[in-house]
């Protein structure tokens, strides 16, 4: 599992109570302005778009994947990847894999890089970009089944429990599939579809061109498959066989995709037969406008319409005036110049902020797709007409900049960028949802039940669907997926356009990206209520819970301890041997993964008095506790601790008193396991005998991520240290003066910076908190350093430069 990324870098502090503050440079959502001609740092935007594609990676992740909260997915309990075709990208906010959108997206990404390679390389993003393209290309290659046949869809597209009915993170999705279906392999289909085969041929031809000099053997394999797939697509000339894509991606035309593929195969091979095929077979069948002999210039580039992409490629290759004029019509149509130029009017609407809004469903993907074509046309087929080139280029820039905040809402529709962004995002893994209840995500309130509203992760670089045709972005919910979803095809043309923007305006990627996120909530947790009590016993009903999201995961060896004091038992003349610990009812039956063995009492060695013992609840296989649903994320066990009512006929009255028991604190007042008052930090949970939740009676506390190998740093003695601003430091990093250094100190710093009227740090606390050695007082940089210390990334405070 690629869990070690969790400790590979350090993030900005995630605040308690939802407080928003300015964080260290590069860790915020703020998009830095470019010092040169452009309005924004387009290299940063491109860098973050690559991050989004890495979030979408399925299967065993490559070492270069930089997403700190992602891990391997679609693997069985033995660690084997089980999809019939491994790897590839998840399509959108779900976990389907479609060869169609993988091929289309990788092709548009490749096109952008190939046209603006020097600029992307100069920005230092070339290797990262090619890594991500190759991930998509290799999936397409593996999906080829020969003679034009392709694996079309991988995912739960049959039966009642389909992919879209499941809301959980990618890392645990296959466990939910297994729970529902009893196996570890997702369904797939093999289809004969000209669109899928042709787009696959196109991107494999591009792969040959991209990698023929650095990996000639792999490049030749790409080209061989590209030729075969093109032959199959041309032979089928049909798009009706869509298999599991039905209702999601209903392909409709083939000639555009075959022409697009033929152009790329010609560029890859120089074989004129591909141009001959275009002229003899595809141009005569090229789509036309309704009730007109004009070639179709309306609508726009998308996964089901590569008409204009094919036309632009053909115009570039041949230089034929009629095709150059055709592209001119298409761009003017998008600029809504129809009435003045003898063209059909734009089918959508131009918003007050200048967005050419084609349709409510992913409007920004359509606008940025066309922006890429317009910028490329300006740089190639229109380059000798400076007025036209500048005009079209300016329009294209406006569509891209609209996404970053030059719009009616002053909102960035690119996540993780800008001061204001949409709050409801249709993306399962980014949400970190553990109980399959997602309706309140991004809303102000979780309702009476307190459902999760906060996202676990920032989905940096993802282009969201966008506003309505008035330029308004309403109070959308996650279910309004036309506006709130993200997808690999949404980012494709946008990313290609960014390559052109970097070519025009330059830019620099962030040096400290991506940040590692600090968990926003406890990943492992215990809750308990009183299930029954009497003069001689206490019966507890407890939940062991898995709310992991950094990354989402399961663990096999899980146990927890309930601590109790035996002093009154001993005072009554009884011995520890008279105490009985026994299991009662529980969620899983004997022999099942989630079944627990209840045992004890065991002496707790951390109590010098010798009076603290504990009952242990150990699960047969804790992987049953998985963050995939309302019943799966927790495992309920009821257990009783008791003494005999009488021994040798003598009552034991007074021998049992739970009021001084470490774990009993709060239990008597807890009302419901579903409510916050039942959360019990004095019942400690362990993974592989490592403390992951709670506090032991001797004060030992769990460390976030301990089950991933993150260990607490040793405390540095600082009693006589001087702060950079003068004065004695009692303990470096201890901003709240509780004698410890942990995340609470970082949180207090950020809260104080955000709301100093409400959150106070004493003068002594400020001395302790100034750990970044910059001599600038207490800043967000100090919180940043404290996090690194808590995560074990630095060994002492203050930080040494």
What residue spans do the PLM features occupy?
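Sec-dependent N-terminal signal peptides of Gram-positive bacterial secreted proteins and lipoproteins
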Residues: 3-25
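A surface/secretory-pathway sequence property marking extracellular, secreted
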Residues: 567-621
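Low-complexity, acidic Ser/Thr/Pro/Gly-rich terminal tails and inter-domain linkers that flank the onset
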Residues: 506-537
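Aromatic-lined, polymer-binding surfaces characteristic
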Residues: 197, 201-211, 219-267, 298-315
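Cellulosome-associated attachment modules in secreted, modular CAZymes
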Residues: 19-26, 711-801
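Aromatic (Trp/Tyr) and acidic
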Residues: 36-51, 55-112, 153-199, 203, ...
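Terminal connector regions
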Residues: 606, 610-613, 625-627, 631-712
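Short beta-strand elements of extracellular/lumenal beta-sandwich folds
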Residues: 534-566
């Amino acid at each position: 599992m690629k869990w070690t990324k969790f400790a590979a870098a350090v993030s900005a502090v995630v605040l308690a109570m939802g407080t928003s503050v300015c964080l260290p440079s590069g860790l915020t959502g703020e998009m830095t302005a470019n010092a040169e001609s452009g309005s924004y740092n387009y290299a940063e935007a491109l860098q973050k778009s690559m991050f989004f594609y890495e979030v979408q990676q399925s299967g065993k992740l490559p070492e270069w994947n930089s997403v700190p909260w992602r891990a391997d997915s679609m693997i069985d309990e033995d660690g084997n990847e089980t999809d019939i075709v491994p790897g590839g990208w998840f399509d959108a906010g779900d976990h389907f894999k479609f060869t169609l959108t993988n091929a289309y997206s990788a092709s548009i990404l490749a096109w952008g890089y190939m046209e603006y390679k020097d600029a992307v390389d100069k920005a230092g993003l070339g290797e990262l970009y090619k890594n991500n393209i190759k991930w998509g290309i290799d999936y397409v290659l593996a999906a080829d089944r020969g003679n034009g046949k392709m694996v079309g869809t991988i995912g739960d597209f049959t039966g009642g429990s389909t992919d879209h009915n499941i809301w959980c993170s990618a890392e645990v999705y296959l466990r939910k599939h297994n729970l529902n279906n009893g196996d570890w392999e997702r369904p797939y289909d093999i289809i004969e579809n000209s669109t899928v085969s042709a787009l696959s041929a196109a991107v494999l031809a591009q792969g040959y061109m991209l990698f023929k000099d650095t990996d000639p053997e792999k490049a030749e394999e790409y080209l061989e498959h590209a030729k075969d797939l093109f032959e199959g697509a041309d032979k089928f000339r049909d798009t009706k066989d869509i298999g599991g894509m039905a209702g999601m991606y209903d392909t409709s035309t083939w000639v555009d995709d075959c022409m697009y593929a033929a152009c790329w195969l010609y560029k890859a091979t120089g074989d004129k037969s591909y141009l001959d095929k275009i002229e003899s077979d595809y141009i005569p069948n090229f789509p036309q406008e309704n009730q007109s002999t004009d070639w179709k210039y309306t609508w726009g580039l998308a996964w089901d319409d590569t008409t204009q992409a094919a036309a632009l490629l053909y115009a570039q290759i041949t230089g034929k005036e009629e095709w150059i004029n055709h592209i001119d019509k298409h761009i003017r149509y998008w600029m809504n110049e129809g009435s003045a130029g003898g063209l059909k009017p734009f089918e959508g609407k131009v918003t007050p902020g200048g967005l050419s809004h084609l349709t409510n469903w992913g409007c920004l993907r359509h606008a940025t797709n066309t922006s890429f074509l317009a910028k490329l046309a300006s740089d190639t087929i229109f380059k000798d007409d400076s007025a036209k080139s500048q005009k079209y280029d300016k329009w294209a820039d406006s569509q891209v900049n609209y996404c970053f905040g030059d719009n009616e809402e002053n909102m960035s529709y690119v996540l993780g960028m800008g001061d204001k962004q949409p709050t409801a995002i249709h993306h399962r893994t980014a949400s970190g949802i553990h109980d399959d209840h997602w309706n309140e995500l991004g809303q102000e309130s979780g309702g009476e039940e307190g459902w999760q509203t906060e996202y676990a992760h920032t989905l940096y670089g993802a282009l969201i669907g966008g506003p309505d045709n008035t330029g308004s972005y309403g109070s959308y919910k996650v279910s309004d997926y036309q506006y709130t979803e993200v997808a690999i095809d949404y980012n494709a043309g946008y990313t290609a356009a960014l390559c052109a923007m970097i070519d025009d305006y330059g830019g620099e990627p962030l040096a400290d990206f991506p940040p590692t996120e600090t968990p926003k909530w406890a990943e492992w947790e215990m809750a308990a209520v009183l299930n029954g009590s009497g003069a001689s016993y206490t019966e507890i009903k407890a939940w062991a819970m898995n709310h992991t999201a950094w990354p989402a995961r399961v663990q096999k060896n899980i146990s927890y301890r309930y601590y109790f004091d035996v002093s009154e038992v001993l005072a009554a003349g009884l011995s520890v041997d008279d105490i009985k610990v026994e299991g009662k009812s529980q969620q899983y039956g004997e022999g099942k993964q989630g079944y627990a063995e209840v045992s004890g009492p065991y002496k707790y060695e951390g109590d010098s008095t010798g009076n603290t013992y504990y009952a242990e609840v150990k699960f047969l296989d804790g992987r049953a506790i998985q963050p995939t649903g309302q019943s799966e994320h927790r495992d309920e066990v009821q257990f009783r601790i008791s003494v005999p009512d009488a021994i040798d006929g003598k009552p034991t009255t007074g021998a049992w008193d739970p009021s001084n028991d470490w774990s009993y604190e709060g239990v008597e007042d807890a009302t419901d396991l579903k409510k916050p008052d039942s959360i019990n930090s004095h019942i400690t949970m362990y993974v592989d005998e490592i403390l992951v939740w709670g506090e032991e009676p001797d004060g030992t506390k769990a460390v976030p991520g301990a089950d991933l190998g993150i260990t607490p740093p040793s405390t540095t003695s600082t009693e006589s240290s001087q702060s950079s601003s003068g004065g004695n430091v009692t303990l470096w990093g201890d901003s709240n003066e509780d004698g410890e250094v942990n995340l609470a100190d970082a949180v207090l710093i950020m809260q104080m910076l955000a709301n100093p009227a409400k959150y106070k740090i004493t003068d002594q606390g400020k001395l302790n908190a100034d750990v970044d050695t910059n001599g600038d007082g207490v800043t967000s940089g100090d919180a940043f350093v404290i996090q690194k210390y808590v995560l074990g990334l630095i060994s002492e405070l203050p930080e040494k430069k």
